[in-house]
């Protein structure tokens, strides 16, 4: 019997959603927070241009504050949660989209809410693309090990630019020029080179 074909991880606007996880005021001290928020904001702009549905969560906003304004998520109604996974809070959004195949995941913290959200989505048979330059943790050890754990569990590790080009698909797309302007904006250092260099054994 032929071996099962591995998932390719294709991302298409009509079968994808963008998840924005807990980028709130009280997390400003988290390492590379400003940088990953800027990349998540870029993903949100592209999602709006391509009509990709987007959901936004806030972890215990009474204590951790609202979503930071620089994300540009004004107009999105945040889902308040206490569970680390986003999935229980946004289950109705998932149920409303039977065509959904892929979730693009940005936010904080990688070892907690990002990991548990990804595991719940994978358990539902969805493909998960963790936007590595739009996720971070207070500890870079936690960030590194969480990314490795996500990969072991079947999530795809992708950069924002790689996913953006998958979503737009073709230079003749009517939104390509607007998206190209976003891609050409300088990308901040989100600390990833230090995690992946020197043949890190967690990513062999």
UniProtKB/Swiss-Prot annotation:
Belongs to the isochorismatase family. One of its GO terms (cellular component) is cytoplasm. It comes from Bos taurus (Bovine). It is found in: Cytoplasm; Nucleus. Interacts with CDKN2A. This is Isochorismatase domain-containing protein 2. It holds the Pfam family Isochorismatase. The keyword Nucleus applies. The keyword RNA-binding does not apply. InterPro entries: Isochorismatase-like_dom (IPR000868), Isochorismatase-like_sf (IPR036380), Isochorismatase_domain (IPR050993). It comes from the Eukaryota. Gene3D superfamilies: Isochorismatase-like. Keywords: Cytoplasm, Nucleus.
């Amino acid at each position: 019997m032929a071996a099962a074909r591995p998932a390719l991880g294709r991302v298409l606007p009509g079968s994808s959603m963008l998840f924005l996880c807990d980028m709130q005021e009280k997390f400003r001290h988290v390492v590379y927070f400003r940088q990953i928020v800027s990349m998540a904001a870029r993903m949100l702009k592209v999602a709006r241009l391509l009509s990709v549905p987007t959901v936004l969560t806030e972890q215990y906003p009474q204590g951790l504050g609202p979503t930071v304004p620089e994300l540009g998520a004004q107009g999105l109604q945040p889902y308040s949660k206490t569970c680390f996974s986003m999935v229980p809070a946004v289950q109705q959004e998932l149920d409303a989209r039977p065509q959904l195949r892929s979730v693009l995941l940005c936010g904080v913290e990688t070892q907690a809410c990002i990991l548990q959200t990804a595991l719940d989505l994978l358990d539902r048979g969805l493909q998960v693309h963790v936007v590595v330059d739009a996720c971070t943790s207070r500890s870079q050890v936690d960030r590194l090990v969480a990314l490795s754990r996500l990969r072991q569990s079947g999530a795809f590790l992708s950069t924002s630019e790689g996913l953006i080009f998958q979503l737009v698909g073709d230079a003749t797309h009517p939104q390509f020029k607007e998206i190209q302007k976003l891609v050409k904006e300088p990308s901040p250092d989100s600390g990833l080179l230090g995690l992946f260099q020197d043949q890190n054994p967690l990513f062999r």
